[in-house]
């Protein structure tokens, strides 16, 4: 049963997703595309299971994007205090641009281009062979500390992660489910 705030969309192909305001999007199943563009502005949440050649994601505001699966190339832009959680997304080449206090965690294997202005942070599983880094401000980039399963340790989760341990509650937002 769907309420007025829930919509279920079944679409054979999804090439672009533009979201504004307080909204949540969760995929049911794996989204397979050559190119996928995602733009989230506001206090939203996007959780997608992907197999893509190229992912272009733009996060503006206090949003959260969570990706898992595979991507050959990703280009992420975070403006503000947003979070991109991509530890479970196997990426070959990544370009990450952060302006503000954003945080990105990813698993990149071949190359990483990182550009941070402000206090943003990038955490990667293992240092790729090719890295090009520019930091203007108090930003940081480093490998995350891992436990025996390859996940972050408790101390790593506390470093720069504004989603854990905050005193304010996350807002209730309407949910959209996408079936592929």
Which stretches of residues belong to each language-model region?
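Intrinsically disordered, low-complexity terminal regions
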Residues: 1-180
């Amino acid at each position: 049963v769907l309420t007025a705030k829930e919509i279920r969309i079944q679409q054979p192909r999804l090439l672009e997703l533009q979201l504004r305001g307080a909204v949540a999007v969760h995929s049911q199943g794996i989204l397979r595309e050559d190119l996928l563009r995602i733009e989230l502005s506001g206090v939203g949440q996007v959780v997608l299971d992907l197999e893509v050649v190229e992912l272009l994601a733009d996060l503006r505001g206090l949003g959260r994007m969570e990706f898992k699966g595979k991507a050959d190339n990703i280009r992420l832009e975070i403006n503000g205090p947003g979070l991109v959680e991509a530890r479970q997304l196997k990426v070959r080449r990544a370009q990450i641009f952060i302006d503000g206090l954003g945080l990105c965690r990813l698993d990149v294997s071949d190359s990483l281009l990182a550009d941070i202005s402000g206090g943003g942070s990038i955490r990667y599983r293992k240092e790729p062979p090719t890295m090009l880094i520019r930091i203007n401000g108090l930003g940081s980039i480093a490998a995350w500390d891992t436990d025996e399963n390859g996940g972050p340790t408790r101390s790593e989760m506390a470093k720069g992660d504004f989603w854990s341990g905050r005193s304010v509650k996350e807002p209730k937002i309407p949910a959209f489910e996408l079936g592929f």
